[in-house]
């Protein structure tokens, strides 16, 4: 009789423990979906999901690695919707070797596809005045910025990451 109670008790405790572990896993998943930025990165790391570095992701999608400032290392990328959110520590301007300048706010979002970033929010470029960039696309030798009108620039100017200079406002 003791053996039967032991087996039933062990089975019952095992079932309870599995439910508790499943509950903890579900809690981690719900926490992960309800928080932003670096915290989400940390939760994903705890869960075992490691993100590739931002330059690697950009290269995979055929975009130059220097489009974003060098200190833009935290990002979120939804594989299903292709939404990219890049977190930048402070509003900054980045100058490139072709003398172009981009200004970044602390959160840049867009829709990432092979060779292009569309529906961009959070980037401006200087064309006599600061103009909002709405899309970035590439081919073998050029990067095309759409900011009211489409403007092409030499791709090699954006192949090296550069640091941004902190500015007061976007």
Swiss-Prot record:
InterPro entries: At5g01610-like (IPR036758), DUF538 (IPR007493). It comes from the Eukaryota. It holds the Pfam family DUF538. Transmembrane segments: none annotated. This is Uncharacterized protein At5g01610. It comes from Arabidopsis thaliana.
């Amino acid at each position: 009789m003791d053996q039967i109670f032991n087996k039933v008790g062990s089975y019952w405790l095992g079932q309870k423990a599995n439910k508790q572990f499943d509950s903890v896993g579900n809690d981690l998943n719900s926490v992960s979906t309800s928080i932003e930025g670096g915290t989400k990165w940390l939760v994903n790391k705890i869960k075992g999901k490691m993100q590739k570095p931002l330059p690697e992701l950009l290269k995979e999608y055929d975009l130059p690695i220097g489009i974003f400032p060098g200190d833009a290392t935290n990002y979120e990328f939804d594989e299903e919707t292709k939404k990219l959110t890049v977190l930048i520590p402070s509003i900054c301007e980045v100058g490139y070797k072709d003398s172009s300048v981009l200004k970044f706010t602390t959160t840049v979002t867009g829709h990432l596809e092979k060779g292009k970033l569309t529906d961009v929010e959070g980037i401006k470029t200087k064309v006599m005045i600061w103009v909002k960039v709405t899309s970035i696309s590439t081919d073998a030798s050029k990067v095309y910025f759409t900011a009211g009108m489409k403007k092409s620039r030499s791709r090699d100017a954006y192949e090296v990451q550069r640091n941004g200079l902190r500015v007061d406002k976007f």
